[in-house]
Regions:
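Class I S-adenosyl-L-methionine-dependent methyltransferase catalytic core
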Residues: 1-198
Length: 198
């Protein structure tokens, strides 16, 4: 197995493959509670563990709200949590591209509430020492820096009493052009994947 580094160049599927190869043992129970179209798992061999998928919109056989999961308390080894954080109220193109049916018209603080609710429920279903994987991205909202990576850490550690297992920084191999020519802050092209231990 090659070394795993915190900084990763590529896409979500590349990162998830590397992290799951390192952290997910054969036969473990993995619940992706924001499955979407399954983009995370396209490059991962999921036959060596039990992958349970659900989504509030895209999984007809498993339409579950991540705030009210169907799993027993303490029954899952890994919960994968990637809620629609790419939002821009009033910009339908952004909301449609990122599947934001549940966050349409929401702002950063509203989405943080969803994170907190989903992470609390994920903690419930995790086994002792189970891992919660949380995807997030910093953003600028109304000309203010919103450091989601810090806010998500505080929810997990201060409120839910979890501990940090790892943090990955994903830098895409290609960056789409921006529409706005005038720049006030550095562009945020990277995202994060937190791993918190129950």
């Amino acid at each position: 197995m090659s070394s795993l580094y915190t900084a990763h160049l590529g896409n979500n599927a590349d990162l998830i493959r590397a992290v799951s190869d390192f952290y997910v043992a054969s036969g473990q129970q993995v619940a992706d509670v924001t499955y979407g179209k399954g983009a995370f798992w396209r490059k991962t061999d999921t036959t060596r563990f039990s992958l349970h998928v659900s989504d509030i919109v895209t999984c007809p056989d498993a339409l579950h709200d991540f705030r009210d999961l169907p799993y027993k308390t303490g029954s899952i080894d890994h919960v994968i949590f990637d809620p629609p954080y790419m939002h821009n109220a009033g910009r339908p193109m952004v909301e449609e591209r990122y599947g934001n049916a549940t966050t349409k018209g929401m702002y950063h603080d509203d989405i943080l509430v969803l994170y907190a609710q989903g992470m609390k429920e994920a903690r419930r279903v995790l086994r002792r020492d189970g891992l919660l994987w949380v995807k997030c991205k910093d953003e600028i909202e109304s000309s203010r820096q919103r450091m989601s990576v810090v806010e998500i850490h505080d929810i997990a550690v201060r409120i839910l009493q979890m501990t940090v297992k790892d943090l990955f920084i994903l830098v895409p191999s290609s960056i789409p052009p921006v529409q706005h020519k005038k720049q006030y802050h550095a562009r945020k092209s990277h995202s994060y994947l937190w791993l918190f231990k129950k």
